[in-house]
Design a protein with these regions (language model features):
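A short helix->loop->beta-strand "cap" motif at the edges of active sites that frequently abuts
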Residues: 31-33, 58-60, 169-171
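Contiguous beta-strand/loop segments that form the cofactor/metal-binding neighborhood of enzyme cores
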Residues: 123, 127-217, 223-225, 250-277, ...
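C-terminal lid/capping helical subdomain adjacent to the catalytic/cofactor pocket in oxidative enzymes
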Residues: 289, 293, 307-319
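Glycine-rich phosphate/pyrophosphate-binding loop
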Residues: 220-249, 253
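Hydrophobic residues in well-ordered beta-strands that form the structural core
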Residues: 37, 43-44, 62-64, 93, ...
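Predominantly a Rossmann-like dinucleotide-binding segment in NAD(P)-dependent oxidoreductases
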Residues: 61, 68-155, 160, 209, ...
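Aromatic/hydrophobic pocket-lining residues that form π-stacking "cages" and hydrophobic walls in ligand
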Residues: 24, 51, 77, 301-302
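Beta-loop-alpha module in the N-terminal Rossmann-like domain of NAD(P)-dependent dehydrogenases
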Residues: 1-54
């Protein structure tokens, strides 16, 4: 309403507590303005479903801020796993450990009115879920979960564990998150175990990807340092992955670089949208509105399972 005549917002960035995500996002999309929103996407499932509906009706770019998808090594990991180099995926351990809530603190994340049904699961468990889904290309179909309160008096969980069935049929995963693990700062990591080998990636050491193959020497691939196809493990590498701008190896990339890459990929779709050209917003470069719905479905399925003492609970799907 206060923008100068002839000017329009390129996109809206929403970095508020969870209960203030839906309203500005919905209004912006209705006005044809792209949105980059923090996760989890909304406070509840109904809001998430309504956002999916309006985004797909209006055909407006929408990005969910799963920043760690912006690491070049995360995208490299996705290529390795989804191209079948590890074989059929048997087991995934995706975890996010922190210690900042080990003592009583009065923060909005532990208030159900502002955070929703889960503190730890919604705040960082959704990141662990997104790493699992993005790197493997698999979905979670059922969960057996425990949302636990380790610091007495809290209304929401500060420790979160979900055992998961995966969409490839026989695959299983552990999605775990903790905010009471003293000594852990921002310890997001994923280990993918296939029938041919294992991949390990750590957010606190984001410059490299470790590969372990049965009967072969261990391999470590460093970002922008001589990664080439046909090396005895890697095959053809996607042109867009190899062309992705990175700084020289040894000049450390970290969170800010991942965040910048996420914005750059989203902004490319925003520019295309503004020019009336096709844009993808398909979840291959950044999380989209459907990924946001899946995150909310996961939180709710896990909360339901936990209330039923860990009973297997199916993941809700979009109506």
């Amino acid at each position: 309403k206060t923008a100068p005549t002839g000017e329009k917002l390129d996109y809206v960035l929403i970095v508020t507590p969870n209960h203030v995500h839906f309203d500005p996002a919905y209004k912006a999309i209705c006005a044809g303005i792209p949105v980059l929103c923090e996760k989890p996407i909304t406070l509840n499932m109904d809001e998430a479903a309504r956002l999916v509906k309006i985004v797909e009706e209006k055909k407006v770019p929408f990005c969910l801020a799963h920043t760690y998808l912006g690491h070049w090594t995360t995208r490299f990991s996705r290529h390795i796993v989804t191209s079948g180099l590890l074989g059929n995926i048997r087991w995934v351990d995706s975890s996010y450990l922190q210690g900042w809530l080990a003592k009583p603190l009065d923060v909005w994340r532990i208030n159900p009115k502002t955070a929703g049904r889960s503190c730890c699961g919604g705040d960082i468990g959704t990141h662990a879920l997104m790493q699992l889904r993005y790197v493997t290309g698999l979905d979670v179909t059922e969960v057996s979960a425990h949302l636990e309160i380790m610091v007495e008096g809290r209304p929401l969980d500060d420790h979160f564990t979900a055992y998961c069935k995966l969409s490839n049929g026989n695959g299983r995963a552990l999605v775990r998150a903790s905010q009471i693990s003293i000594g852990h700062k921002n310890d997001l990591g994923i280990e993918v175990c296939g029938e041919k080998g294992t991949l390990v990636w750590k957010q606190e050491d984001p410059e490299c990807v470790h590969i372990y193959l049965d009967g072969q020497p261990d391999r470590t691939y460093w970002r922008n340092n001589g990664i080439t196809p046909n090396d005895g493990f890697l095959k053809d590498l996607p042109a867009d992955l190899m062309a992705e701008p990175t700084i020289p190896s040894g000049h450390g990339e970290a969170f800010h670089d991942a965040f910048a890459r996420l914005h750059r990929c989203f902004e490319a779709d925003v520019r295309a949208y503004q020019a009336g050209k096709p844009f993808k917003c398909d979840g291959t470069k950044y999380a989209n509105v459907r990924d946001g719905y899946v995150g909310m479905a996961f939180i709710n399925a896990c909360a339901d399972s936990s209330e039923a003492k860990g009973a297997w609970t199916p993941m809700p799907t979009l109506p």
